[in-house]
Swiss-Prot record:
This is tRNA dimethylallyltransferase. Residues 39-42 are annotated as: Interaction with substrate tRNA. Keywords: ATP-binding, Magnesium, Nucleotide-binding, Transferase, tRNA processing. Its EC number is 2.5.1.75. It comes from Bacillus mycoides (strain KBAB4). The record marks T105, R128 as: Interaction with substrate tRNA. Its cofactor is Mg(2+). Gene3D superfamilies: 1.10.20.140, P-loop containing nucleotide triphosphate hydrolases. GO terms for biological process: tRNA modification. InterPro entries: Dimethylallyltransferase (IPR039657), IPT (IPR018022), P-loop_NTPase (IPR027417). The lineage of its organism: Bacteria, Bacillati, Bacillota, Bacilli, Bacillales. Pfam families: IPPT. PANTHER family: TRNA DIMETHYLALLYLTRANSFERASE. Belongs to the IPP transferase family.
Length: 317
């Protein structure tokens, strides 16, 4: 018997504001593809501006998945994301189309592509409650520091504001004596798909300028009104509100900072996130990097994917 044919998947990664959205749509048109969002925050309805969600006009008729599937009050674990995206890949492939994942969130994308197993076996409800209480009494940074002490790799990857995941990593260490990062490292070697990974990068100063401009544009487009709607609706302490662009504006609405300080912090956090995204992808995955400082590289990237996945684009006919 021959080897089972693995499903082909193209993945576009890179820091926020680097130009992934336009490239993904150009590639989808050329490669008969459909797009799956690999951004863990674009799943939330009504959170459009702050997540830089693709608009209907930008989609230009290309089907998009994993967008607007949950309410902001809902949680959505990496395991649920993994299951949902794999289902999208299966269905898109069955239609004779190429799945194109656009990200996004490093761990989430990695969990889809590699043979990650998520288990709830390691659990200690009493310990979890203790950590939740400590987070309430002493703040999220306190429990994040505890994680830094026992599992610095996970602490680097998990933002302090993502309390649920911080406590989960602590709980795994407490229960098994093993770092969560070690458990994941053991599992991530085998790719489940025939993958072409495309990474976009650009000159850091130019990228940071683009991020600052994007934040200014978000404010002009109505980010304050979008966040105010969530705030007035009573959305609090949810996974969704930990997203960059929301937690900073929440601080403004709750009179902890001025609007100027909130916007400045949003820009700073966005730049830091972009740096973390690049570090993650460079350390974890075999990526074909394309520097788009001097402009788009769509034709070059198209040829790269065609070669990697042994495909013919509409442009090649």
């Amino acid at each position: 018997m021959g080897e089972v044919q693995r499903e082909k998947v193209a993945v576009i990664i890179g820091p926020t504001a680097v130009g992934k959205t336009k490239l993904s749509i150009d590639l989808a048109k050329a490669l008969n593809g459909e797009i799956v969002s690999g951004d863990s925050m674009q799943i939330y309805r009504t959170m459009d501006i702050g997540t830089a969600k693709v608009t209907t006009d930008e989609m230009d008729g290309i089907p998009h998945y994993m967008i607007d599937i949950k309410d902001p009050e809902d949680s959505f674990s990496v395991a649920e994301f993994q299951e949902s995206v794999r289902k999208c890949i299966r269905e898109i492939t069955e239609r004779g189309k190429l799945p194109i994942i656009v990200g996004g969130t490093g761990l989430y994308i990695q969990s889809v592509l590699f043979d990650y197993q998520f288990t709830d076996e390691a659990g200690d409800a009493t310990y979890r409650e203790q950590m939740e209480k400590l987070a309430l009494e002493h703040g999220v940074e306190y429990v994040h520091k505890k994680l830094q002490e026992v599992d610095p790799e996970s602490a680097e990857r998990i933002h302090a504001n993502n309390v649920r995941r911080v406590i989960r990593a602590l709980e795994i260490f407490h229960t098994t004596g093993e770092k969560m990062s070690n458990q994941l490292e053991k599992q991530e070697n085998e790719l489940l798909y025939d993958v072409s990974l495309i990474g976009l990068t650009m000159d850091r100063e130019m990228l940071y300028d683009r991020i600052n401009l994007r934040v200014n544009l978000m404010i002009e487009q109505g980010l304050l009104e979008e966040v105010k709607g969530l705030h007035e609706r009573g959305v609090r302490d949810c996974q969704s509100i930990q997203a960059i662009g929301y937690k900073e504006i929440y601080d403004y609405f709750e009179n902890r900072v001025s609007l100027e300080e909130a916007v400045s912090q949003l820009k700073t956090n966005s730049r830091r996130y972009a740096k973390r995204q690049l570090t993650w992808f460079r350390n974890k995955m075999d990526v074909g990097w394309f520097d788009v400082t001097d402009g788009e590289k769509t034709s070059e990237i198209l040829r790269y994917i065609e070669g990697k996945l042994q495909l013919k684009s509409n442009n090649s006919k």
